[in-house]
């Protein structure tokens, strides 16, 4: 044995024997039986708690079901649908008018497809067929 590696090998051997004596566990107080008992008892408590909550929710749901099944007049639903359609149509028109100035429009008959703003605030039509008088 090399004198430099002998202490490290001895330390590893002692550590191995210590862990082998404990059954591979790092803590001497823990045992396989007690750890599994604690885990199963904790899981069992959680399971019982969740089952209790589930049964409470089911009781609440069954008590609320008769209230939800009450028939409503179809006229009320139709008037609501018409009102929402009117609101949606109005909203579409507002959005269309708001977006309209942003999009370039073609001027009919002139062939224009947009406008150009110069740095000095003068504007000109792009692609416009304009007859100029001399």
Curated annotation (Swiss-Prot):
The residues forming the signal peptide are 1-26
Consequence of changing residue 99 to A: Loss of FURIN-mediated proteolytic processing in HEK293 cells, however processing in HL1 cells, likely mediated by CORIN, is only slightly reduced. Loss of CORIN-mediated processing in HL1 cells
Annotated Gene Ontology cellular component terms: cytoplasm; extracellular region; extracellular space; protein-containing complex
Task: Point out the glycosylated residues in this chain.
Answer: 41, 62-63, 70, 74, 79, 84, 97
Is-annotated flag, keyword Iron-sulfur?
no
PTM comment text: The precursor molecule is proteolytically cleaved by the endoproteases FURIN or CORIN at Arg-102 to produce brain natriuretic peptide 32 and NT-proBNP. This likely occurs after it has been secreted into the blood, either during circulation or in the target cells. CORIN also cleaves the precursor molecule at additional residues including Arg-99 and possibly Lys-105. In patients with heart failure, processing and degradation of natriuretic peptides B occurs but is delayed, possibly due to a decrease in enzyme level or activity of CORIN and DPP4.
InterPro entries in alphabetical order? Natr_peptide (IPR000663), Natr_peptide_CS (IPR030480), Natriuretic_peptide (IPR050787), Natriuretic_peptide_brain (IPR002408)
Q: Which Pfam families match?
A: ANP (PF00212)
Query: Which Cys pairs are S-S linked?
Result: 112-128
Q: Which SMART domains match?
A: NAT_PEP
- One GO process term, biological-process aspect: cGMP biosynthetic process
Could you say which residues are annotated as the site Cleavage? 99-100, 102-106
The miscellaneous remark of the record is: Plasma levels of natriuretic peptides B, brain natriuretic peptide 32 and NT-proBNP are widely used for screening and diagnosis of heart failure (HF), as these markers are typically higher in patients with severe HF.
**What family does the Swiss-Prot or TrEMBL record give for this protein?**
Belongs to the natriuretic peptide family.
Q: What is this protein called?
A: Natriuretic peptides B
